[in-house]
């Protein structure tokens, strides 16, 4: 089973990423579950998302404490220890950043396999907005191959109509531009 945990700030529409990835996996004949949880403090509000995908029925129904994959929609969230907490030793972290993987390793002490993508820039260039959900989904698909990239296109078109084409283009660009650097020993 592939277990993924997403971290985002409120308003980044991470809930849509969790839902679309879950629906795409089901459309491909896999078992999938996804849900989100909001947490807020007096300073700021954040959202965590959880996705499980498997070839077998999923009987767990809980938050993911030890994910195979952590997806961070805002690099500033890495300053919080709980974001990377529990990542499996063979786990992967995908991050929205303009920095190279070695810069992330130096800044945050990350040893996991890293996938980095400039989702903010892709969203601005293609969508004319800061909505990073489509580019981040492209990065997730590149790193995990959990579903074919094309599995998202009909879902985006169904949900967004003509704007779905632009969202799929952002997803495709992120898929191509995501840089993966293997885990440091």
Q: What annotation goes with each model-predicted range?
A:
Residues 1-185:
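Active-site cofactor/cluster-binding pocket
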